[in-house]
Amino acid sequence: MSLIRLNIDSFRNIQLAQLSPSSGINLIYGQNGSGKTSILEAIYFLGMGRSFRSHLSQRVINNEQDKLTLFATLNLPRGDSKIGLRRFRSGETEVKIDGEKVKRLSTLAETLPIQVITPESFSLLFEGPKSRRQFIDWGAFHSDPQFYAAWVNVRRVLKQRNQLLRNNSSYDQIQYWDREFVRYTEQVTEIRNRYVDSLNELLKGIIGEFLPQVDVKVSFTRGWDSKTDFAQLLESQYPRDLATGHTVSGPHKADLRLRVGSLPAQDALSRGQLKLLVCALRIAQGKLLKQQIDKHSIYLVDDLPSELDAQHRQLLLKQLVDTGAQVFVTAIEPAAIVDSLHTPPSRMFHVEQGRVTVIE
């Protein structure tokens, strides 16, 4: 799978751009503020319905316009597919796939799986468990068609349960929701656990390429003691949950634990090593997607020269090429990427003040 055409209209400082990317390595270069990262952000927005840089989607709309429009043609095994997204400053979103209106943004994510390696994505290890849950759930969503519905139900029931707790409801009033919570939690947890097990099989070899002298152990924690029955735990922790006004334990507390020896990876590794570990996780996740559903991710790699030294840039780019996936990578100077590749980029784009030029 790859993008063979991309149209960007009124996205940040890009008034209008049309790109015909290669299915291999696409290098986008230009000075800071030129708009090169905005191209990656536009692709991400088209696949996720949101930005990886800002939680306020209205900010990505060009200041002089009341809406943005993104359009792409995808090359898929079954043939070409067309995706369009329009976001209005009012917050309304319109999505079409092959001319048909789509109501759920999850359909975009299913159609256009995207992996991001940016300065922001390194928060996967530097921050709390939320980003690591999102990492697991991205893979679980793509690997098992039953995951999304179960995950939505977990969120719905958890919201209802927390509202009852804030209202000082008796446990008799909460019991019905707990039965629902347990049922959907079991589904979500089983799929998450199975996904992490599969990821681990691939991850060992890839981590060995990036960090050959480091033994990293990866494990999934479900959000409560695995030796404890979840239904019994909810009942026994009801007084504590009532006191805090929210559910203390459950699938919303799940995490991906990475350890080196007896220490968390965050404490045992340098910041540079942690960045390489995040790269290994993203590469492994993309390779597993290809194994499980025979679909490539699209990789968006932003500002690589500022994040990794020349040796590790070369290693990451080699790994990306080996995936066979389509890659978009940005840099200020093209030489920083070209010199790290064994072969020239398949296509190069220069960006200046929001204008995109193909370099032949």
UniProtKB/Swiss-Prot annotation:
One of its GO terms (cellular component) is cytoplasm. InterPro entries: DNA-binding_RecF (IPR001238), DNA-binding_RecF_CS (IPR018078), P-loop_NTPase (IPR027417), RecF/RecN/SMC_N (IPR003395), RecF_2 (IPR042174). The keyword Lipoprotein does not apply. GO terms for biological process: DNA replication; DNA synthesis involved in DNA repair; double-strand break repair; SOS response. Keywords: ATP-binding, Cytoplasm, DNA damage, DNA repair, DNA replication, DNA-binding, Nucleotide-binding, SOS response. The keyword Transferase does not apply. It is found in: Cytoplasm. ATP binds at residues 30-37. One of its GO terms (molecular function) is ATP binding. It comes from the Bacteria. The RecF protein is involved in DNA metabolism; it is required for DNA replication and normal SOS inducibility. RecF binds preferentially to single-stranded, linear DNA. It also seems to bind ATP. HAMAP family: RecF (MF_00365). Belongs to the RecF family. This is DNA replication and repair protein RecF. It comes from Shewanella sp. (strain MR-4).
